[in-house]
Amino acid sequence: MKKEETPADKLLKKAESKIGCSYEYGATGPDKFDCSGFVQWCHDQIGVTVPRTSGEQYDQGASATGAKGDLVFFKKNNKINHVGICDGDGNMINAQCSGVKKVAISSVKPNWGMGDNCGYKTFL
């Protein structure tokens, strides 16, 4: 019997389909994204409404643990400045604003100057 696809599975599929798309500040898809626009677009594709900015997403999301489909947030200078979608294996799919400047898979551990990991939230 085939296992039914969970909302987290569906979200990850949408996120994976955009790997390689360009980063652009303020962009919300479907071919260019900033980090929070990417998160919002992916959720929208599975029928889940998510706020536009990473700060709003952090404030309005429910507490989570970093499981598949959860959002991971980063803070720099006391301000939420980055968000990605957890794959459940210690990585995230995110629209990177520096480095490759594309939607890519990277570690949930802080790197490329994104700030400190400050927690996980979910809208699923």
Predicted regions and their residues:
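Thr-Gly-centered strand-to-loop micro-motif
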Residues: 25-26, 74, 95
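Soluble non-cytosolic domains of exported or imported proteins
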Residues: 2-9, 29-33
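Catalytic cysteine-centered active-site loop
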Residues: 17-68, 115-118
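Aromatic- and glycine-rich peptidoglycan recognition patches
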Residues: 6, 13, 52-64, 80-124
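A general structural signal for well-ordered alpha-helical packing
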Residues: 8, 12, 36-39
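Short, intrinsically disordered low-complexity segments
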Residues: 1-2, 51
